[in-house]
A protein has these predicted regions:
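Short, charge-rich amphipathic interface segments used for partner binding and complex assembly
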Residues: 7-49
Length: 49
């Protein structure tokens, strides 16, 4: 569901921020991943079903 997908993306954002996911990434890589996830969340928010 949309709620489940949103929760999974938000968890991924937290894990990237806390270095739980991909701990060797540079700050620039983390920032880029966060921007991509923000875009994914925006698209998901616009999705109606």
């Amino acid at each position: 569901s949309k709620v489940d997908m949103t929760a999974r993306l938000l968890k991924l954002k937290r894990d990237i921020d806390n270095k739980m996911a991909w701990p060797k990434w540079s700050p620039t890589e983390r920032w880029a991943a966060q921007q991509a996830l923000n875009s994914a969340l925006d698209i998901l928010d616009e999705y109606h079903y």
